[in-house]
Amino acid sequence: MSENLDKSHVDEAGEAEAAASEQGLEGALECSDETLQKKVKSDSPSSQRVGRPHSSPARLVTVEELLETAKGVTNMALAHEIVVTGDFRINAVELAEGSLEKRVKEIVHKAFWDCLSVQLSEEPPTYDHAIKLVGEIKETLLSFLLPGHTRLRNQITEVLDLELIKQEAENGALDISKLAEFIIGMMGILCAPARDEEVKKLKGIKEIVPLFRAIFSVLDLMKVDMANFAISSIRPHLMQQSVEYERRKFQEVLERQPNSLDFATQWLEEATNDLLSQKYKHALPAGGGAAGSGDAPLLTPVSVQNFAYLKLLKWDHFQRPFPETVLMDQSRFQELQLQLEQLAVLGAVLLVTFSTAAPGISGHADFAEKLKMMVKTLLTDMHLPSFHLEDALASIGEKVCLEVSSCLSLCGSSPFSVAKETVLKGQIQALASPEDPIRRIMESRIFTFLETYLASGHQKPLPTVPGGLGPIQKELEEVAVKFVRLVNYNKMVFCPYYDAILSKLLLRS
């Protein structure tokens, strides 16, 4: 709601920012709206901690310790969410249609507004409920003010003086319409430009009860705007301090729960063993004999960490607990994993199409892009439970053959034979199996590209994509940039813990 500053006193913004800085990062997060916490919780999937091994002895903890730990984790997750998600915003809560919660809310609200309508219809009118509403509106308007908004604060306090309003009601001198007019005017001053239209519509409502209902509806939207304004205000401070803040909060959690690095240790140990096994195989002589001691492969902490992050893109989120140090980004890693799986199938379909149909057909940029978008659209819901990849690939095979035949006809090339069409459909349908050789080649090349980009220190330009990935280069580079950004931020926060764990693992290896 940064627009609010432009609509009142711009010079007061500096005072407000200074006040916010004095409160500090901790205070800003401690006072965060409950809605923010709900969003963080909804964006973070369950850690699926099944069959948890304990590397540290179990100890009894009090309820207070658990609550304090949960509070620390929530604040850490909130700071992380705001920093990592550049467009982090709070949206108004929408209750599901037909839900019990929505039904109860509707019944309670209807009863309240009906009661207000009855009171105002009496002779003389009773203003008990109306005065309570004015009090709530007053508190809401005051909450929108910045520390420097002295004049506006005085106006609201003076006009919406509840004691004076009660006296006027008792003496039959209360003009509720005049109060509503002041409230709407003040809302127009404090609201973001995006709410101007809603506030303007309030002026056209003449009946008191519908007017108050509409006022509260717009005020709810303004609360969301204010929360988003607060987020945008503290984001620069978070960016400066988030690494130290997250590390400090995680250390507090670790001190209360010493086994909070169990899964991270397992993750790094598994990566070390897998990488060591790979390098050892490559170090073996061609004859298959044992490698000498001088040939023993050496691992570095960086190579193990990079390999460990790549393993997160093939994680079984339903059966394996996610490492604690990357838990707040589990949903992001999971999203990247799904995108890469879809890209592997998409790339494989395009590869077999261009190699089977006619080598020269891929040179037609418009056709290649059209074909890619068509296949991509048909694979959009690939990871929904209701999606059947076999059926989708059968449909894709039919459509691809039609597009290829049409393109060959327009180019004046030899027509697409029935034999080639049958082969192409069969190859596309075979991609439904994760073990299909072409699909596995695509996955291998995709991970080779990610590994190269990660090891390059995300320097520009990006590494050259391996052969066969050209048609999906744009999509792959977008995923790679997101992946490396996540990895580098995670390294900055948790590098001391990773270094401590890997120093022991590599020494033992």
Swiss-Prot record:
Keyword presence, Ribosomal protein = no
Give a single Pfam family match: Tcp11
Record field: compositional bias (Low complexity): 16-30
Ranges of Basic and acidic residues compositional bias? 1-12
Give the region (Disordered) as residue ranges.
1-57
Keywords (alphabetical) are:
Phosphoprotein
Supply one GO CC term from the record: microtubule
What are the Phosphoserine sites (modified residues) in this protein?
Answer: S56
Q: Does Ribonucleoprotein appear among the keywords?
A: no
Q: Belongs to which family?
A: Belongs to the TCP11 family.
| Name assigned to this protein | T-complex protein 11-like protein 1
